[in-house]
Amino acid sequence: MSRLENLTSKIIKDSEEKAKIILDEAKREEEKIMLGQKQEGESIKSKIIEKAYLESKNRKERIISNSHLFVRNRKLEAKQEVIDKVYKEALNKLAKLNKEEYLNFIKDSILALEIYGDEEIILSQDEKYINKETIEEINKELKSKGKKGEIKISDKKRDFRGGFILNKDGIEINNTFEALILSLKDDLEPVIIDTLFS
């Protein structure tokens, strides 16, 4: 029996050694896997942190850029409001010309135009100074310049602040105060901006 016990004892011992080897190998494999997982986790963590950093940096830059754009647009809007007020004030001053200044402006404007002298003059619905006598004076001066001198006041009235529109065969020359200011706008805007905002 002692031989049987020795054999059994040896089998048990061999089994325990094999089990220990298998367990040690399993433990090393587990550590290897854990190390790989840890390294992969660290790599993923680094990538996530880097991505978050880049996204936050880009977001910050977008916010700053949008802020600059917003401020610039507000400045432009404010400048445009001031410019619009300047034009409105200019229009108001033209509309408040006294009778003599206004009629001289109308006469000088018509006489300076390259026209035939037989156009129809369309006036503002609020016109208070231009009448037949005014047109007769203008016609006399047109004749003295070799033109027809047959301008007539139109029955049509339009909605504008002052000035006039000359019409012949459907072609109009717009000399209203609004049109004059608008035509000068491109030339005057840089001057106004320099004067007001420099």
Curated annotation (Swiss-Prot):
Keywords of this entry: ATP synthesis, Hydrogen ion transport, Ion transport, Transport
A GO CC term assigned to this protein in UniProt: proton-transporting two-sector ATPase complex, catalytic domain
Gene Ontology biological process terms, A to Z: proton motive force-driven plasma membrane ATP synthesis
Presence of keyword Transport: yes
Any GO molecular function: proton-transporting ATP synthase activity, rotational mechanism
InterPro entries in the record: ATPase_E_C (IPR038495), ATPase_V1_Esu (IPR002842)
Pfam families according to UniProt: vATP-synt_E (PF01991)
Family of this protein: Belongs to the V-ATPase E subunit family.
Xref: HAMAP family: ATP_synth_E_arch (MF_00311)
Job description of the protein: Produces ATP from ADP in the presence of a proton gradient across the membrane.
Protein name in UniProt: V-type ATP synthase subunit E 1
Organism of this sequence: Clostridium tetani (strain Massachusetts / E88)
Lineage: Bacteria, Bacillati, Bacillota, Clostridia, Eubacteriales
Originating gene: atpE1
